[in-house]
Amino acid sequence: VRQCFNPMIVELAEKAMKEYGEDPKIETNKFAAICTHLEVCFMYSDFHFIDERSESIIVESGDPNALLKHRFEIIEGRDRTMAWTVVNSICNTTGVEKPKFLPDLYDYKENRFIEIGVTRREVHTYYLEKANKIKSEKTHIHIFSFTGEEMATKADYTLDEESRARIKTRLFTIRQEMASRGLWDSFRQSERGEETIEEKFEITGTMRRLADQSLPPNFSSLENFRTYVDGFEPNGCIEGKLSQMSKEVNARIEPFLKTTPRPLRLPDGPPCSQRSKFLLMDALKLSIEDPSHEGEGIPLYDAIKCMKTFFGWKEPNIVKPHEKGINPNYLLAWKQVLAELQDIENEEKIPKTKNMKKTSQLKWALGENMAPEKVDFEDCKDVSDLRQYDSDEPESRSLASWIQSEFNKACELTDSSWIELDEIGEDVAPIEHIASMRRNYFTAEVSHCRATEYIMKGVYINTALLNASCAAMDDFQLIPMISKCRTKEGRRKTNLYGFIIKGRSHLRNDTDVVNFVSMEFSLTDPRLEPHKWEKYCVLEIGDMLLRTAVGQVSRPMFLYVRTNGTSKIKMKWGMEMRRCLLQSLQQIESMIEAESSVKEKDMTKEFFENKSETWPIGESPKGVEEGSIGKVCRTLLAKSVFNSLYASPQLEGFSAESRKLLLIAQALRDNLEPGTFDLGGLYEAIEECLINDPWVLLNASWFNSFLAHALK
């Protein structure tokens, strides 16, 4: 296609497509259409001038000193902002009605905008589509076809015969050029209806009044404001920009020095509690190696098989009650699970899924019939004191040490591999050697990482829960929490962490909540850090024999039970937790790239194989922590995984706002003499997010360590 047009037109067409996020290499027909259209617009305007007597004349090679003005203003081929600026200024100076869509040309002789069309179909069809689309009496339409036909509004063709013949000849040449390269047939057939021109959205009525009322000071109308915004140059001196914006703003730029920043204030209050959807470092697995039982791979079969590996069950009792809940119900729920699993065993054929009986304890735990009754708005809009519930402010919590321990554990290696080599996904294109080498090195560093176990566990639980929520909306389905891995010797292993019982799940919207009760095995005694387990009721359900250096010891086995909830959108993201692998791989790649550009050769091999080199991992009160490249990979992965496990509005806000302060501090560290205004406001915005979320509080304390060291 490129060879059929001149380089300037090709460049403009590529720019136009990029602006709409389209790729000329892929959408070649569209690319050809845009090139053709641009060329016709330029030819339309070529050689046409207006002389000093305001007469329209044609000059092909004339006196360069003659006072001539171009007859046509070319709008097509400019970027959107610029194009609208031109249209606005034409309308302001000539009083012509402003078009809804960006036209192609403006004719200073006839004082009208022109819409040019080039079609591979019937000119009439295309003309009608254009007319229907722009719905404006004022804009003149002129359509050309590749077969030499044309059609224009009121049969007024604007230009002389010869100029139009030149355009038709060129179109015919383009057609031949494309045909000789085997492009024409596909191009001819690919034309779709009219859809690409951008609409100028007119605001009327109430919305218009609201818009006019909410303009910044010093703007008399929405139009003025639009024109100002279109012409706003984003770079330049800040003080100048601010004074340009408004007389009321007088931002004094304060220098940001080593002594300027203060640490973030972390909230006081009781220690924060665990809020993840499943247990992390405290989880305990019942496992089977080399599973080959009948129905292997069916979750319920696998779960029963795992349960049978344990012989230390005992009469359960509550060791740490839930402060607000009806604790006997949690106990009864676990007993019910055991009893119903036993019932399954006694049946001839084990079913593939198990729906729990709707007992009073499960109805209570799953919040059945607890939702306030929905009333049609029509029936209550006359109620005089209709208002939303007052919701309590969230209670402040202080940072507790358990969340740092959780993070450290997530960075550690386990003795099993949780992903296969291809888990990060093959590229569609034949991938260059370097990228696959990096991916393999990275996978080797993280495949045994505990954070990777959390990913696979999260993917499994969310997938199973979303499936059950759609397939068994009314049932209290029992969902085993399962993961699969390989041992050091490469043997397959299936693990059971516990069970989930799902509540009613008629999920219409993305944010509609499905309640569930989770019951998870653990060897952690909840009485050691009771604040961490505030939301749980913990039972003691058995004794487990553990092999230690001293011999076998018996340890009590606990069951952590809580009610919880999630939504379609959260489950969707949970199912996609493997993205964390990709995100951390990309962060590592950018480190390798930086290293490689300094050394001017690819450093992938050295990067991963030079075991002596240490890398900065993070800041702690002790200073900058360093570690091997593997440790860096696992730390980055753990951060990404925790961002997913502990996702929350507090985290979103903290990440966005603290990043600004981080950039300022880094600028100071690089001796760039940064300046700020309203630093107090920035601190407020950051600290507003420090309420009670364990992961956000931990990140804030890391941030304080960073500030302290960065500005020493």
From Swiss-Prot:
List its EC numbers.
3.1.-.-
What are the binding positions for Mn(2+) 2 in this chain? 76, 104
Descriptive protein name: Polymerase acidic protein
Q: Which cofactor does it need?
A: Mn(2+)
Coiled-coil spans are none
Would you identify the family this protein belongs to, as annotated? Belongs to the influenza viruses PA family.
Organism, scientific name: Influenza A virus (strain A/Hong Kong/212/2003 H5N1 genotype Z+)
Q: Partners and quaternary state?
A: Influenza RNA polymerase is composed of three subunits: PB1, PB2 and PA. Interacts (via C-terminus) with PB1 (via N-terminus).
- Keywords noted in UniProt: Cap snatching, Endonuclease, Eukaryotic host gene expression shutoff by virus, Eukaryotic host transcription shutoff by virus, Host cytoplasm, Host gene expression shutoff by virus, Host nucleus, Host-virus interaction, Hydrolase, Inhibition of host RNA polymerase II by virus, Manganese, Metal-binding, Nuclease, Phosphoprotein
- Outline what the protein does: Plays an essential role in viral RNA transcription and replication by forming the heterotrimeric polymerase complex together with PB1 and PB2 subunits. The complex transcribes viral mRNAs by using a unique mechanism called cap-snatching. It consists in the hijacking and cleavage of host capped pre-mRNAs. These short capped RNAs are then used as primers for viral mRNAs. The PB2 subunit is responsible for the binding of the 5' cap of cellular pre-mRNAs which are subsequently cleaved after 10-13 nucleotides by the PA subunit that carries the endonuclease activity.
Give the enzyme class.
Answer: hydrolase
Q: Mind telling me how this protein is modified after translation? A: Phosphorylated on serines and threonines by host kinases, including human casein kinase II.
Where does the motif Nuclear localization signal 1 (NLS1) lie? 120-135
Superkingdom of origin: Viruses
The UniProt entry lists the main location of this chain as: host cell
Question: Which terms does the record give in the GO molecular function aspect?
Answer: endonuclease activity; metal ion binding; RNA binding
According to the record, how does the cofactor bind?
Binds 2 manganese ions per subunit.
Q: Where in the cell is it found?
A: Host cytoplasm; Host nucleus
